[in-house]
Structure formats: C-alpha cells, structure tokens
Amino acid sequence: MKYGIVGYSGRMGQEIQKVFSEKGHELVLKVDVNGIEELDSPDVVVDFSSPEALPKTVELCKKYRAGLVLGTTALKEEHFQMLRDLSREVPVVQAYNFSIGINVLKRFLSELARVLKDWDVEIVETHHRFKKDAPSGTAILLESALGKSVPIHSLRVGGVPGDHVVVFGNIGETIEIKHRAISRTVFAIGALKAAEFLVGKDPGMYSFEEVIFGGE
C-alpha cells in the first residue's frame, strides 16, 4: 500500500510512519507546515493534524482518488460537510479515537448504561499539556455511547497520551471503568487497520467500528 501523511513531522505523523513502515507500506506523500513532497500517487492519506489542514487534505485526496483516514479532533460542522462531500468520491474513515480498546469500551458502555440507567455517571479525561481541545473527542465519543449528557472533567497535565475514566455511582457502590493509552502507538496501529480496510473500498463514510467489528 502506498500512503501519505498530513502532519508528517508531528508526533503522530512520525508514529504513523514508523508503524506503517514496519508493515512494508510505502510513504509517497509528505505534508507539513513547511510544504508538500509528492513522490507517487497514494492509495490512502492519513491525517491526524489539525482542522485547519483539512481543506488541503481533501484537495489531495480528490487529486489522487485516495481514501482518507482522519483522526483530527475539534471538528466543526463545516469540516463534516467537507467529509460528506469527499465521501461521494472516495472512501473515508473518520474517528476521534483510533484505539481499538476505546472502541470496544464504547460498545460495552452502551450496554452498561442501559442496565444502570438510574445511576449517576461522570467522565474524567486526562491528556498532555499540549492538547488544545477540552473535553477530548474521545470523552465526547464515550458520552455518546451513554446515550445522555453527563459531566465531563478535563485535565491537561504533563505528557499523558490519554486516560479516560467512566464512573457509575449509586447509593452504596460505584463502578469505575478506565482506559489508558500507554503510548501514541495504539492510535497509529488503529490508523493502519483503517487504511488497509479502505484499500479497494467504494466511496462512502465508514466508521472505525466497521473497521474493527465488520458487519457485527
């Protein structure tokens, strides 16, 4: 598979290159704030950079008829409209979190929330000091799995890749469910699965849950 990275020189960009290269995939498109290096036509473009970069990413996907794996957070309606328009021409996977564990947790939370519908629920999320958006896209994703609005507490400290704790409480007992990303590698592994999934797919919007669970 030939692939491109938007945000190539960033921390996630470097992690993505490492994981993809270990599987023998060829980096043929590099995009960062310093410019664009186009070596060949990519099958898939991976973007974990910023919302401001999305117009250029969409332009490149259309130019090369390349699928898009998008892990950028803090997206607005205008960005989702760009993705919907792009998905008429190429396959797209957009997710706020490409950790397989988080997406398994999301499915589990939906069932737990149904059973514990009368319990109090709150979410605590912790990320590195450089993360700009709060609450995190992942916390919002987990909240959506609960099926209702709940308090979300955001901490920005040190170099934490990502901790999410969902706390259910009732009189006399609590349940805490925690997911911890040990390193950014987990997100790059998820991006790889999504990229390989997109190769040969018809145009359209695909969820990361479809990548993981298929038609289940």
Curated annotation (Swiss-Prot):
Q: Which InterPro entries match?
A: DapB_C, DapB_N, DapB_N_CS, DHDPR_bac, NAD(P)-bd_dom_sf
Principal location listed in the UniProt entry: cytoplasm
Protein localization: Cytoplasm
GO annotation (BP), single: lysine biosynthetic process via diaminopimelate
Which UniProt keywords are listed? Answer: Amino-acid biosynthesis, Cytoplasm, Diaminopimelate biosynthesis, Lysine biosynthesis, NAD, NADP, Oxidoreductase
In short, the EC number is: 1.17.1.8
Q: Does the keyword Metal-binding apply?
A: no
Residues reported to bind (S)-2,3,4,5-tetrahydrodipicolinate: 128, 137-138
How would you classify this enzyme at the top EC level? oxidoreductase
**Which SUPFAM superfamilies does this chain map to?**
Glyceraldehyde-3-phosphate dehydrogenase-like, C-terminal domain, NAD(P)-binding Rossmann-fold domains
Tell me where on the tree of life, at the top rank, the source sits. Bacteria
Annotated PROSITE patterns: DAPB
Any keyword Transmembrane?
A: no
Binding-site list for NAD(+) = 7-12, 71-73, 95-98
> Could you cite one Gene Ontology molecular function of this protein?
oxidoreductase activity, acting on CH or CH2 groups, NAD or NADP as acceptor
Q: Which CDD domains match?
A: DHDPR_N
Q: Its annotated pathway?
A: Amino-acid biosynthesis; L-lysine biosynthesis via DAP pathway; (S)-tetrahydrodipicolinate from L-aspartate: step 4/4
Question: GO CC terms for this protein?
Answer: cytosol
This enzyme catalyses:
(S)-2,3,4,5-tetrahydrodipicolinate + NAD(+) + H2O = (2S,4S)-4-hydroxy-2,3,4,5-tetrahydrodipicolinate + NADH + H(+); (S)-2,3,4,5-tetrahydrodipicolinate + NADP(+) + H2O = (2S,4S)-4-hydroxy-2,3,4,5-tetrahydrodipicolinate + NADPH + H(+)
Family to which this protein belongs: Belongs to the DapB family.
What the protein does comes down to: Catalyzes the conversion of 4-hydroxy-tetrahydrodipicolinate (HTPA) to tetrahydrodipicolinate.
Q: Which PANTHER family match?
A: 4-HYDROXY-TETRAHYDRODIPICOLINATE REDUCTASE 1, CHLOROPLASTIC-RELATED, DIHYDRODIPICOLINATE REDUCTASE
Q: What is the protein name stated in its UniProt record?
A: 4-hydroxy-tetrahydrodipicolinate reductase
